[in-house]
UniProtKB/Swiss-Prot annotation:
The gene is prfB. This is Peptide chain release factor 2. One of its GO terms (cellular component) is cytoplasm. SUPFAM superfamilies: Release factor. Peptide chain release factor 2 directs the termination of translation in response to the peptide chain termination codons UGA and UAA. Keywords: Cytoplasm, Methylation, Protein biosynthesis. It comes from Aeromonas hydrophila subsp. hydrophila (strain ATCC 7966 / DSM 30187 / BCRC 13018 / CCUG 14551 / JCM 1027 / KCTC 2358 / NCIMB 9240 / NCTC 8049). PROSITE patterns: RF_PROK_I. Its main location: cytoplasm. InterPro entries: PCRF (IPR005139), Pep_chain_release_fac_I (IPR000352), Pep_chain_release_fac_I_sf (IPR045853), PrfB (IPR004374).
Length: 365
């Protein structure tokens, strides 16, 4: 005799959760918008404006993810219920086991969609940048900044975000002083936005002949790439533009000409750099895009900080807030906001950050 009730109960719960998501995610409006986007992309002159066509293509993927998944879940629950009915009628154990497996697959899809619901911020679907800056502490801190850079590059590769090293300034002896990475892909900013803050390393330094324990800090700042139609006024008189010869690891790919660009926004002290192209003009354009995005995100964070101060919320989004502690001697990495920790330090340093990121998103940071 088959255990039918647990499967039917699961299907009922899946259907109820799917209906809730249908409302939360505004399924009807998204389906209507998807039809509009598809119609626009079918126009023969759509590629006369390549940037708009690319934006529409990106929007279509995001809409299809929601609409298609909800359609799959709705139809899938009906199909599995029918399989269960057929299995019971025919006393067919293989068909029943297939139905159980299909129900599990549907639940996985639903959990993934429920998780995506946390990406409700205006810029969560956007590409993003991560700025990494070593703290005080000389070579040890610069080596730590390089470890953090490697960690995020590995994470980006594993998640298909095509990480691109926009700028990297070598350390005096080892490691790096600073770096900027661009992540391209759906919900890049949504995934990474809670990584902003100070990351603290405690270990026996390989650069200390006495093998003493050192504490080093590294600042991480995540900001979304913003649309050109968002108006950020930047007065050219407020900018200091420097050109210099590129430095940093990269072998034959390092730009050896004096085309690297650094732009300082004097009123705020914000600095952006780009050295990944041989064209000074292209590097300057990239710097201006980063500056615009960074000033926008800083303004949003300032507004959020003021709002949170009024509401006395628990989370400090300030640049100086310490978010995670990496104590390598004790084999322990702990998120100071959520309490999540792991002893598999090497896996985390190799880019396995999902446990920490998911916990911070679920807690509404």
């Amino acid at each position: 005799m088959f255990e039918v009730n647990p499967v039917l109960n699961k299907l009922k719960e899946l259907s109820e959760r799917t209906e809730l998501l249908r409302g939360y995610l505004d399924y009807d409006a998204k389906k209507e918008r998807l039809e509009e986007v598809n119609a626009e992309l079918e126009q023969p002159d759509v590629w006369n404006e390549p940037e708009r066509a690319q934006a529409l293509g990106k929007e279509r993927v995001a809409l299809e993810n929601v609409v298609g998944t909800i359609d799959t879940l709705t139809q899938g629950a009906d199909d599995v219920a029918m399989l269960v009915e057929l299995a019971v009628e025919g006393e067919d154990e293989d068909t029943f086991n297939e139905a159980v497996a299909e129900a599990d697959v549907l639940e996985t899809k639903l959990v993934d969609l429920e998780f995506r619901r946390m990406f409700s911020g205006q810029h969560d679907p956007s590409d993003c940048y991560i700025d990494i800056q070593s703290g005080s502490g000389g070579t040890e801190a610069q080596d730590w900044a390089n470890m953090v850079l490697r960690m995020y590059l590995r994470w980006g590769d594993a998640h298909g975000y095509k990480p691109e090293l926009i700028e990297c300034s070598e350390g005096d002896v080892a490691g790096i002083k600073s770096a900027t990475i661009k992540f391209t892909g759906e919900y890049a900013f949504g995934w990474l936005r809670t990584e902003t803050g100070v990351h603290r390393l405690v270990r026996k330094s390989p650069f200390d002949s006495g093998g003493r324990r050192h504490t080093s800090f590294c600042s991480v700042f995540v900001y979304p790439e913003i649309d050109d139609d968002i108006d950020i006024e930047i007065n050219p008189a407020d900018l200091r533009i420097d050109v210099y010869r590129a430095s940093g690891a990269g072998g034959q790919h390092v730009n050896r000409t004096e085309s690297a660009v650094r732009i300082t926004h004097i009123p705020t002290g914000v600095v952006v750099q780009c050295q990944n192209d041989r064209s000074q003009h292209k590097n300057k354009d990239q710097c201006m895009k980063q500056l615009k995005a960074k000033l926008y995100e800083l303004e949003i964070q300032k507004q959020n900080a003021e709002k949170q101060a009024l509401e006395e919320t628990k989370s400090d989004i300030g640049w100086g807030s310490q978010i995670r502690s990496y104590v390598l001697d004790d084999a322990r990495i702990k998120d100071l906001r959520t309490g999540v920790e792991t002893r598999n330090t090497q896996a985390v340093l190799d880019g396995d950050l999902d446990k920490f990121i998911e916990a911070s998103l679920k807690s509404g940071l």
